[in-house]
Amino acid sequence: MSRIITAPHIGIEKLSAISLEELSCGLPDRYALPPDGHPVEPHLERLYPTAQSKRSLWDFASPGYTFHGLHRAQDYRRELDTLQSLLTTSQSSELQAAAALLKCQQDDDRLLQIILNLLHKV
């Protein structure tokens, strides 16, 4: 018979979702997976201590704020609707063109959803 052996040094003995406050704790304090929709942050400073320039570019490319809520379809659609309403109320021609492009994209998305629903029924 084979046995499953846990490895406490990599933290797989307690796999459970945790809150954002618990994410600030160090690895010895917690052995859990982040909540659904949140990425597992890489430890670049520890893994690649010599790549200073790449690390500074990575810090510039990944801002401190995140949009985890946009992974959910309803939140994404709501944010797109508010963005479109802001763009259509502006007086700038560039923003009006962006609103028209966003409207075309939303129409295409709705058409693809209709086609997908029809394919499921067939």
UniProtKB/Swiss-Prot annotation:
May possess both an mRNA signal and a syc-dependent signal capable of directing its export through the type III secretion system. Required for Yop secretion. Interacts with YscY. It comes from Yersinia enterocolitica. It is found in: Secreted. Induction: Temperature seems to play the major role in regulation of transcription of the lcrE-containing operon of pYV, whereas Ca(2+) concentration has only a moderate effect at 37 degrees Celsius, and no effect at room temperature. It comes from the Bacteria. The keyword Phosphoprotein does not apply. InterPro entries: T3SS_YscX. GO terms for cellular component: extracellular region. Residues 71-87 form a coiled coil. The region between residues 50 and 110, which contains the predicted coiled coil domain, is essential for interaction with YscY. The gene is yscX. This is Yop proteins translocation protein X. Keywords: Coiled coil, Plasmid, Secreted.
